[in-house]
Design a protein with these regions (language model features):
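PLP-dependent amino-acid enzyme catalytic core
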Residues: 1-174
Length: 174
């Protein structure tokens, strides 16, 4: 997914530019022609005033999953772990202890390998068999739709490099 072509980002730029549609269209045109754009100093200043950003790599993601599992008995997925970790960075830097709600939309079962490794378990299987291992270790119920995959045949096993995607898709459609 190319987040630079996100309608949410475009709406944010529109808001931060003082609803300057010509400026935002210029960014989108530049993105289309050059593959990137740089926003104005005014938009950068507005972003810095309203937002705080951080970074969470794989190691810190795993540590956060393990910490929340140990401290709260709650198994979080990798995406939620990044959000939690960056929130903790924000609190440490700013001292802001405002109550925070995380709306976690992913399941730890979507990332079994990473979650198992994070909680100190070596993944011992592959594919849907990992669902059982994570369930045995965590006690967290496997989501119904993922559990329904057990025993089903794999429909697709083709992988493609980015530069080959167009050809692979066209060949598949023949």
């Amino acid at each position: 997914m190319d987040i630079l072509i996100s309608s949410n980002l475009e709406r944010l730029l529109f808001d931060l530019s003082g609803e300057n549609d010509v400026e935002v269209k210029g960014y989108m045109d530049q993105l289309s022609k050059e593959g990137c754009y740089e926003v104005s100093d005014a938009i950068k200043a507005a972003l810095k005033e309203r937002y705080w950003g951080g970074y969470c790599g794989e190691e810190d993601t795993a540590k956060t999953i393990a910490a929340y599992n140990t401290k709260y008995g709650y198994l979080i997925d990798t995406h939620t772990a990044v959000a939690v970790n960056v929130m903790e960075q924000y609190r440490a830097e700013t001292g802001d202890e405002t109550t925070t709600v995380f709306v976690s939309t992913a399941s730890p079962y979507k990332f079994c390998n990473h979650v198992l490794s994070a909680i100190g378990e070596e993944p011992k299987a592959d594919g849907v068999e990992l669902l059982d291992q994570l369930h045995e270790v965590s006690g967290v119920t496997v989501p119904r739709r993922l559990a329904a995959l057990k025993g089903k045949n794999r429909r697709f096993d083709l992988t493609a490099e980015k530069q080959d995607m167009e050809k692979v898709v066209l060949d598949f459609l023949k």
